[in-house]
C-alpha cells in the first residue's frame, strides 16, 4: 500500500493488481522527469493535438447573463474535441516507453474512449475500450468514431450499465493482461499513481491559462469554474492556481433531477468517504455501504465517486463544490450556443449553468474563466430527442 499525503487516495487493490500498480508507480517516477519523454510529449501535443488552445472572451454571453468578464478555456478545440486527449496521449506514450503493445480504457461520455483510440492509432498500439451499455446507446457518434479508429468497443451490460461498470471490466482485463497491456485510466482517480499521472498530463491546461490571462489582463482570474465528474478537467484547470488563495476554485457536479429525487451524481452534496475502484474518496453509498446508482444527463459526470485531490480540497476549503441540474445545464447549453456560436458539451454546460446562477451578483470588473472541457457534437442526438420547449 502506498502512503498518500492526505487520507484520500491510496491503492486498495486485489492481490493480482498489486504488482502491476507497483511497477507502474516505479516507472512513472522515472519517466515524469525524463527529458526525452517530456520533449516527445510536448512535440506531440503541439504538432498533433493542437496545443495551446485559445482563451476566448465571450462578451455576448456575459451580457446575456448580466455578468462580469467571462473567458472560456477552449479545450473543445483540441483534436478529438475535448481535454481527454492530453491524458490519453501522455499515457499511451508512457505505454510505449514501458514496452506495452495494448491499451485498455474505460469511457462514459465516449470522449476518453475516442481520445485513447486516437492516441493508439497514432502511436501504433492495440486498443480496447469498455463502455456501459446505456452510454453506448446515448453516445453513438463517439462509439462509431472509436470503431473507425480501430478500437474494439466492448458494451458492458453488468450492474447499472454505466461508467463504474466499465471501470470494473477494464480493471478485470488489466489484471490478466498487464504483462503486455497498459490501463489508460481517464480521470484523476483510481489507485495511486493514477491521480498523479492524470493531474500531471492535464495540468497543461492551467499552465496555458495562467500565461494567457496574464497576457490579456495582467493578473490571475478571480474565479475558475469547471464541471466535475471524476475530476480530471477540473484538477488540470485548477492546478497552477491552487497556490494563490485569492483565486476562487469552483467545481460543479451533476445534479441530475435534483437532490430530493435521488437521481443525481452529487458526491459532495450527499456522499461520504469510502473505498471504490481502488481509492478512498467521497462516494455515493447507502447506509450499508453499497454504492448507489447515479444519474446525470451528462455521461461524463455519471460516476459515484470523485478524485482524491478534489476530496482533499473540499475538506480543506480550498475549493467550493456545488451542482447544476440537468435542466439548468440544458439552458446554459443553449445560452452559450445562441449568444456565441459555440456548442459546449453537456459536461461543460454544468459549469456554465453555475456561472449563470451567480453572474448577476458578481462585480463587473471581476474575471471568471470557465473550462470548456469539450464540444457538444456528441450530445446533439440526445438533446434533439428531448423536449424542444426548454429552449424555444
Swiss-Prot record:
Metabolic or biological pathway: Amino-acid biosynthesis; L-tryptophan biosynthesis; L-tryptophan from chorismate: step 5/5
Lineage start: Bacteria, Pseudomonadati, Chlamydiota, Chlamydiia, Chlamydiales
Enzyme Commission number, as recorded: 4.2.1.20
UniProt gene name: trpB
Similarity section: Belongs to the TrpB family.
Modification N6-(pyridoxal phosphate)lysine, positions: 84
Catalytic activity: (1S,2R)-1-C-(indol-3-yl)glycerol 3-phosphate + L-serine = D-glyceraldehyde 3-phosphate + L-tryptophan + H2O
Domain of life: Bacteria
Top class in the EC scheme: lyase
GO biological process per UniProt: L-tryptophan biosynthetic process
Cofactor: pyridoxal 5'-phosphate
SUPFAM superfamilies in alphabetical order: Tryptophan synthase beta subunit-like PLP-dependent enzymes
Organism: Chlamydia trachomatis serovar D (strain ATCC VR-885 / DSM 19411 / UW-3/Cx)
Protein name: Tryptophan synthase beta chain
GO terms, molecular function: tryptophan synthase activity
UniProt keywords, alphabetically: Amino-acid biosynthesis, Aromatic amino acid biosynthesis, Lyase, Pyridoxal phosphate, Tryptophan biosynthesis
Keyword Amino-acid biosynthesis: yes
GO cellular component: cytoplasm
Segments forming a coiled coil: none
Physiological role: The beta subunit is responsible for the synthesis of L-tryptophan from indole and L-serine.
PANTHER family: TRYPTOPHAN SYNTHASE, TRYPTOPHAN SYNTHASE-RELATED
Assembly information from the UniProt record: Tetramer of two alpha and two beta chains.
Amino acid at each position: 500500500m502506498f502512503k498518500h499525503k492526505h487520507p484520500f487516495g491510496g491503492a486498495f487493490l486485489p492481490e493480482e493488481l498489486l504488482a502491476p500498480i507497483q511497477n507502474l508507480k516505479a516507472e512513472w517516477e522515472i519517466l515524469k522527469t525524463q527529458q526525452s519523454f517530456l520533449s516527445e510529449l510536448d512535440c506531440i501535443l503541439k504538432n498533433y493535438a493542437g496545443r495551446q488552445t485559445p482563451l476566448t472572451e465571450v462578451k455576448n454571453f456575459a451580457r446575456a447573463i448580466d455578468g462580469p468578464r467571462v473567458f472560456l478555456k477552449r479545450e473543445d478545440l483540441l483534436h478529438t474535441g475535448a481535454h481527454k486527449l492530453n491524458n490519453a496521449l501522455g499515457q499511451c506514450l508512457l505505454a510505449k516507453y514501458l514496452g506495452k503493445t495494448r491499451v485498455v480504457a474505460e469511457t462514459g461520455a465516449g470522449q476518453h474512449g475516442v481520445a485513447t483510440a486516437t492516441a493508439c492509432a497514432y502511436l501504433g498500439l492495440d486498443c480496447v475500450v469498455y463502455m456501459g451499455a446505456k452510454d453506448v446507446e446515448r453516445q453513438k457518434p463517439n462509439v462509431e468514431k472509436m470503431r473507425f479508429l480501430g478500437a474494439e468497443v466492448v458494451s458492458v451490460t453488468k450492474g447499472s450499465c454505466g461508467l463504474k461498470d466499465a471501470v470494473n471490466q477494464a480493471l478485470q482485463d488489466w489484471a490478466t493482461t498487464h504483462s503486455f497491456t497498459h490501463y489508460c485510466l481517464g480521470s484523476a482517480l483510481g489507485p495511486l499513481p493514477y491521480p498523479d499521472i492524470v493531474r500531471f498530463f492535464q495540468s497543461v491546461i492551467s499552465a496555458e491559462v495562467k500565461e494567457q490571462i496574464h497576457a490579456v489582463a495582467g493578473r490571475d482570474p478571480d474565479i475558475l469554474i469547471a464541471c466535475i465528474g471524476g475530476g480530471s478537467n477540473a484538477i488540470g484547470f485548477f492546478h497552477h492556481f491552487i497556490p494563490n488563495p485569492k483565486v476562487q476554485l469552483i467545481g460543479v457536479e451533476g445534479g441530475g433531477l435534483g437532490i430530493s429525487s435521488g437521481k443525481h451524481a452529487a458526491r459532495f452534496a450527499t456522499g461520504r468517504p469510502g473505498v471504490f475502484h481502488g481509492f478512498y474518496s467521497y462516494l455515493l453509498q447507502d447506509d450499508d455501504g453499497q454504492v448507489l446508482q447515479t444519474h446525470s444527463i451528462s455521461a461524463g459526470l455519471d460516476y459515484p465517486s470523485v478524485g482524491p485531490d478534489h476530496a482533499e480540497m473540499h475538506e480543506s476549503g480550498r475549493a467550493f463544490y456545488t451542482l447544476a441540474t440537468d435542466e439548468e445545464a440544458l439552458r446554459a447549453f443553449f445560452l452559450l450556443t445562441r449568444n456565441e456560436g459555440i456548442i459546449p458539451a453537456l459536461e461543460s454546460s454544468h459549469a456554465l449553468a453555475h456561472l449563470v446562477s451567480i453572474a448577476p451578483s458578481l462585480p463587473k470588473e471581476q474575471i471568471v474563466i470557465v473550462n470548456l472541457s469539450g464540444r457538444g457534437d456528441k450530445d446533439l442526438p440526445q438533446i434533439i430527442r428531448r423536449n424542444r420547449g426548454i429552449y424555444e
